[in-house]
């Protein structure tokens, strides 16, 4: 069985040195505390104690910082999912796990159904905006997870579980379906406590839709 790993990239957004990690960590905290409105360059500088020049040496502005948050989040997600599915019995079982985990979100890992709601809703809004404003950079940021899904689909084709087709394109379709639906759900839940039962039911519905679309 393959050892799934997030692809390595030399993209400056994805490669985080210690200073970049400090900045991205501050962005995470600000999004958790105040949502998108709280994520300003001034707030990041105050939180990190960095000089303005030190931040602008790494990020041209707020959009680049948000892209770095996406890149870091999706790369870590791909690594975690790769480890989680490594011992599952077949490609469809592995993809099922990933789709379900994306829909359920943070609670799939630590059982916290309320943590990170502001951040998740804020990032959903930014994902939709950056898909139009910075599509190439956003695609690079999310590519580790799409590449992982493509690898699993390719193996599913080899084992006769997944219909023949271009794995990368099919992976993009799966990701877009899942992520767009999750964004809508997160924005609907922004001012409320997440509905655990509804989220679980949604995961089942989305997986069934994906399964029927890719099944051999």
Could you tell me what each predicted segment is?
Residues 1-7, 104, 143, 147, ...:
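C-terminal peripheral helix-coil segments that are non-catalytic and often amphipathic
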Residues 103-151, 161, 168-169:
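Short secondary-structure transition hinges
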Residues 16, 20, 66, 70, ...:
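Amphipathic, non-transmembrane alpha-helical scaffold segments
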Residues 22, 30-64, 68:
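Helix-turn-helix
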């Amino acid at each position: 069985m393959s050892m799934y790993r997030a692809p390595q990239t030399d993209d400056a957004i994805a490669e985080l040195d210690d200073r970049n990690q400090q900045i991205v960590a501050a962005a995470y905290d600000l999004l958790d505390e105040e949502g998108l409105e709280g994520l300003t360059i001034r707030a990041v500088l105050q939180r990190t104690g960095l000089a303005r020049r030190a931040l602008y040496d790494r990020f041209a502005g707020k959009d680049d910082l948000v892209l770095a948050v996406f890149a870091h989040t999706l790369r870590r997600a791909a690594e975690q999912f790769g480890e989680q599915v490594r011992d599952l019995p077949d490609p469809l079982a592995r993809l099922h796990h990933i789709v379900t985990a994306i829909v359920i979100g943070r609670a799939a890992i630590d059982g916290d159904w309320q943590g990170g709601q502001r951040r998740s809703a804020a990032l959903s809004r930014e994902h939709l905006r950056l898909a139009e404003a910075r599509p190439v950079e956003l695609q690079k940021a999310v590519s580790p997870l799409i590449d992982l899904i493509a690898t699993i689909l390719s193996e599913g084709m080899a084992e006769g579980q997944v219909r023949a087709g271009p794995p990368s394109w099919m992976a993009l379709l799966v990701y877009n379906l899942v992520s767009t639906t999750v964004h809508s759900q997160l924005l609907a839940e922004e001012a409320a406590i997440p509905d655990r039962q509804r989220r679980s039911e949604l995961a089942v519905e989305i997986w069934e839709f994906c399964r029927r679309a890719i099944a051999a």
